[in-house]
Amino acid sequence: MTDEQRKAELDKAIAGNGMVGQRLLSETDEVRVWTIDLAPGERVGYHKHVLNYFWTATRAGKSRSHYADGRVAEVEYKEGTTRHFTFGPGESMVHDLENIGDSRLSFTTVELKKGSANAPLPLALKPEN
């Protein structure tokens, strides 16, 4: 990916790309449930988190994320690792996620529409189920 392509993708995410996973499994008035399953070297593009959410690693692995503020973070996960995030009014986080390990890396992410300080971002797709 060129720097120009990365910048265009980042700008789109900042504007409101709410696709926080690869597959939207379910959506109700209260939650959105997503999955991510990345082969080594695969990447989920920049996306924007505005809702309170949590993710759980369903396979162990290692990732690299680039953030809109310029930070770069590498993280190792054990199966079952879970992390929670909370956002206040107008707060958000924009990042990408790349599998830099040598095995598949998978997550389930649950966005909490009910109880979040921000409205959910609109999506251009419907849940698979």
Tell me what each language-model feature is.
Residues 32-37, 44-49, 53-56:
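A generic structured-segment signal
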Residues 1-35, 43, 65-67, 71-94, ...:
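A short, N-terminal "cap"/entry segment at the start of jelly-roll beta-barrel domains
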Residues 49-71:
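Glycine- and acidic-residue-biased ligand/ion/polar-headgroup-sensing regions
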